[in-house]
Amino acid sequence: LNKVWGMAGLAAMLLSGTALASEVERVPHGVIVTPDQGAAKRVRVLAYGDAAFRVTAVPASDLNLPRSLMVTADAAGDPVIAETRGLVTLKLAKATAEIRLSDGRVQFRDAAGKLVLDEARRRFTATSADGKPFLATEQQFNRGTDEGLYGLGQHQNRQMNYNGEDVELAQHNMDIAIPFLVSTRNYGLLWDNNSITRFGNPAPYAHVGQGLKVSSGGKPGWKAEYFLGEKLAVTRQEPFIDYQFIKDQANWPEAAKAQTVASPQSGQNTAGVVVGKQSVVWSGSVTPDKTGTHKFRLYSSSYVKVFADGTEVLSRWRQNWNPWFHNFELPMTAGKQVELRIEWEPNAGYLALYHSDPLAQPDRHSVWLSSDVGRAIDYYYVGGRNMDEVIAGYRGLTGKAEMMPNWAYGFWQSRQRYETQEQLLSVVREYRKRDIPIDNIVQDWFYWPEDQWGCHCFDAKRFPDPVGMVNEAHALNTRVMISVWPKFYPNTANAKELMAKGHLYLGNLKAREKDWVGKGYENTDYDPYAPEARAIYFRQMKEALVDKGFDAWWMDATEPDIHSNLSIEQRIDRMGPTAQGPAALFFNSFPLVHAEGVADGLRTALPDKRPFILTRSGFGGVQRTSSALWSGDITARWDDLRDQISAGVNLSMSGVPNWTHDIGGFALEDRYTNQEPAHVAEWRELNLRWFQFGAFSPLFRSHGETPKREIFEIAAGDKAMYESMVAYDKLRYRLMPYIYTIAADTWHKDGTMMRGLVMDFPRDRKTWNIDDAYLFGPAFLVAPVTGFGARTRDVYLPDGAGWYDFATGVLYKGGQTVKAAAPREAMPLFVRAGSIVPTGAAISHVGEQPDGPIVLHVFTGASGSFSLYEDDGVSPKYQQGKFARVPVKWDEGSGALTIGAREGGYDGMAKKRAVSVRFYTPGRAVVPDFAESAQSFVYDGSAITVRRP
């Protein structure tokens, strides 16, 4: 029996709640199925528009869940519902969901009817949090898939295509958890769970020595040798390697302990350094039970190397107050030993080694999500014709990406930290004196008196006139961003107000934990999950800072990082319970609700200004909070530079278009901090290469610990480096019409600025795994150089387009790898044939010459178009239609460039503008100063056609 219900025939049933069949109940916008068997007792599927569904599965009968923190949309749309051959089908205009009556499994088809997402195993496991019952949840899809998978936030292990990878989503200084995936099959999957979540293998990795057997000298366990200097202090057998957290340091052998002393703020380890050299060597034979690719995760800080059968497989350094995971894989055969050796210079650091056995190939290559704490399996399917449409659909669920003010896309100068207002202002004055473009200066932490963290006040000796400081910066056409934390010392008036209302977390205070400042001070964070707490927090911030005229808000440590190097269990204890429930249930969502409170406050307090927030962490929906994200306290290492490419691209593909990184890396090895002569050349080259990458990132921001990062400081005495940095800065400003347009498109077209090659070239499978290049808007292919001394690099040019070398004008056919020239002062950069790239005048800040001339660079070889965007740059009036577009279209066949009639307008818009057109043909290099012009005219808003000479 086939049953099909149209909307007219459903009206009475909707009113009466009549079941459509014994196993199926029609509800507004969808159905609830009670399967015959399986883990889920009830499965609800609801439509969210014309291409999205929500699936909720529970092992009991209750489907009433709290309102999602991530999703702001409501169920909408009326699918055509049919029951046939044991399936209930919900058909929308652009997507179809099918539910099996036998076990409640759901599968999804695209607009053409092609199966793209198919549930496999589903599991619920009883668990608890704060003594209350909850569920650990697990859902697998698409076993044995060959699709490309992207998104999931920002991760630091050079993972681009997640197919076959394992990723833990748990907020951390450098790791951002956003449980949203986008697939080459043109669907997205939003996993609506706020707790710690895993993609891939749901089983946590085990210490090497627990699951994977290890032996040495005929005995179980590792041979561990502890050295003080060159002297062997302790040799012992250890079952596994685990110095991951502060609590684990108690296991350090007494005879191998070294004296520690405090280190300078800018040194390798602000928690202290050891006196003399300290090292540990672990060696052992590991014997696997399974044949296949074994995965390892080394959690480490300081210098560490890993060798397998004598071959180095990993070499990393990371600052000790911010250790993190480093992944590697080894092909291993069951029963065949592999000799592992780990060499570590701990310097009072942290280290642990974990392992995961190979999964069956259909499981390794699947979409598999699991969460520690929840109430149900709850996820959203989002369909589309391409990845851009999928990301747009995700934003339709979780909120549009707010436009940033135009000055946010200029250059940002920062350092850790300006100690006085005179230091900050002197930097701005020097940039202006040298005519180096800049728009933003940043006041990092510790502008307050030492014992007053959370007062949002200024140390009067160092910052005697913060209002005057802001005013002078403004007079120099520069905005000021200031650091504001969710952290409080309990003695401050702000903390006392929050405490009186019950809005401070108590765990850190009960533990009497002290921070690293001065003698150390007890501290904690506020609880943003209560609306009243968010209102108090913003009012305190407004009265102390917003009213002084600061322009942008650096929301640091928003994971929250209440105390570094605590275990997950300790972190949960310190960050809860929240006003909405156990901390374990809300582990990943703090940065979202915190940013929402600040953004809402800013919109109310300053209704004529677009807010700008820079936050270290984010969650699903953070793009709606006027927030840009950055990649945390990464290190000044070539491998970290390389890691930022895939980190930024995947965050962008998670629906967050505004992203940045600390140019040069935040934390430094002592060889750089001390400017050791043997390493100065590498330090400078690293910063220059990173600066080149930064100029083609969504936000262009220099920041880090000593040495000073200002262009005129870091390049002092190196004329070629200085000139290259200034040239890239000026190029960024020349490109501002292009950059601001692609930035505006993130709102108006739900676009993405920093694009994985796979987004534009999904049919070219070679693009799927490229983790060292990306597209910056539709025109530019950016290929950062990430190795010291490299003067060429291989660049894959995607099939389906021609590519101009930006430096030489040589036109390459796509679908090939070219060896691009990469002198120290230049980064390989390519432009897609058919691109139209608008550039502007030579300016020193974005507000200069709002009516300045435009050059339209037309890269011939294919037809193309560009919609040049303008608005007032600072207000939210763009949301009311106050903006202008100039459509530009290039027809390769006729050789005609059509500049269309201006569409729209806004207050202060230039009515006329000088426009030049330059056509590029193979072999013609892009003119760096943009002075040369083929044809020039005055554009008054009327359409005009220009023909190629």
Which residues does each PLM region occupy?
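Catalytic and substrate-binding clefts that recognize carbohydrates or anionic sugar/phosphate headgroups
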Residues: P35, E83-K219, A308, S315, ...
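Extracellular/secretory pathway-exposed regions associated with glycan biology
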Residues: Y205-K295, Y299-R375
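A low-complexity, Ser/Thr/Gly/Pro-enriched, surface-exposed linker/loop concept
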Residues: E23-V24, P28, L46-L90, T127-A129
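Solvent-exposed beta-strand/loop surfaces of large extracellular or lumenal domains
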Residues: L63-I81, Q268-T270, A308-F328, G507, ...
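Short, well-ordered beta-strand segments enriched in hydrophobic/aromatic residues
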Residues: V33, V43-V45, V55, T89-L90, ...
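Aromatic- and carboxylate-enriched substrate-binding clefts and catalytic-loop regions
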Residues: A60, H326-F328, Y350, P437-M725, ...
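Catalytic core of carbohydrate-active enzymes
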Residues: A599-F612, G618-W630, D643, L651-H661, ...
